[in-house]
Amino acid sequence: ADAMVVDVEQSLREHRLEEIYYRTDHHWTVLGAYYGYRAWAESMGFVPREKEEFAAETVSRNFLGTVQAKVGVGAEPDRMERWIPVDGTEWEAYYDRAEEPAGLYAESALESRDKYRFYLDGNHGLTEIRRVKAGGNGAGENGAGENSARENGAETSGRKLCIIRDSYANSFAPFAACHYDSVFLVDLRYFNGDLETFLEQEGITDILALYRIPGFAVENSVWKMGKRG
């Protein structure tokens, strides 16, 4: 299978004067994740969704992240957002093979110290995002107005994405889900299954490894990518 490295750095540099990273945390913001998504989508041959296709909602103005916790000096809290598709597309999430669906956003996290857990309920070994309602703007798999891709209210791209990831994928995955029937997120730190078997059983068509480089360089679980049997 073909493999490629997506040049996200160039896209982020072009928007370096915008709030693409939190001041008090090591993660990118939803805006930063969006620009990363655009670079990835273009590399995949998808037409990226435009910012205007989402409604940005501020969910917290009191986010103090990991950098603040380590440094311990006073800092202005960060603002957290979620972006909702204006076309009405809806998803549900299943965490660690749970039988009952949950939302993509953990509202209770906003009242806790770990507010970043708001995005996809934090770190799970396995997360599945399923589309339950397709949008009504006529955009097909590539967001290019392909009405023929709509069937019975669902977008039938026939493709499944697996993101092998760290927590940087938590705010990225909802954007990627615009182009797939299902998106799986595998965190190798907590995933104890056989990865190759999982990919085959779920019929995964596309794989993305998404990591923050400093974390990936010292991550001791990536050997599982090459594990067989």
Q: Whereabouts are the PLM-identified features?
A:
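Extracellular glycan-modifying ectodomains
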Residues: 1-229
